[in-house]
Amino acid sequence: MLLCLALLEELLRLRFGERFGAALPLLPQAEELADMGIVPGGAYRNRDYVKPHLRVLDGAQRARLDLAADPQTSGGLLVALPREDAEPLLRELQTFAPWSAIVGEVSELRATALEFD
């Protein structure tokens, strides 16, 4: 069985409340293409998989949600760490991986594990 995990699924595996979306860094033109519906079919399957655990907040951009569910956005390099350690690590990461970013914040477990803003 081949599994295509996306950022949404990797966040869900943490089993914490997580709010993210607007801070998600995107490649140039990715959002424009997603607005036109140009995303892999796996993105829709991934989104359906996490849907019971996901609350999309008012004003969230559908294209960004599609991109977060894109199997190419695997969270294999997703890191969870204490808030006070995040900025120093980010500065160090950005010296050799300038696309590194803080994409969300872990909070207490809620009825919906993920919130997309």
Predicted regions and their residues:
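Glycine-/charge-enriched secondary-structure boundary and capping motifs
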Residues: M1-D117
